[in-house]
């Protein structure tokens, strides 16, 4: 059993936009895919005229296995969907946001970041403490 949840819909893995937000939000609603970014100038195969590119996977284990054997690749990141999140425009100023936001996260943030019904309310009541 994995420490991390798999993509919510494996049929959609690889169809999400490459350019998304990066980090932030404190909470996530859905795991969309795990990404391994490849850099040709660091030894990855040059598949896109020297440009950075990624491979998408449904599980962390698939992404990690690929990353471990692919020269010039980064450690896996996870693409998450946020329907509600915390914006922190300046340090310790927290704003509850709603909508749909796609963002890449460090995989380990999944361990404590799944949004439950009261997660954001509790976060705000505690002044930003988790």
Q: Language-model segments: which ranges?
A:
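A short, charged, amphipathic alpha-helix used as a generic interaction element across diverse proteins
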Residues: 49-73
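Short beta-strand micro-motifs in enzyme catalytic cores
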Residues: 30-32, 73-81
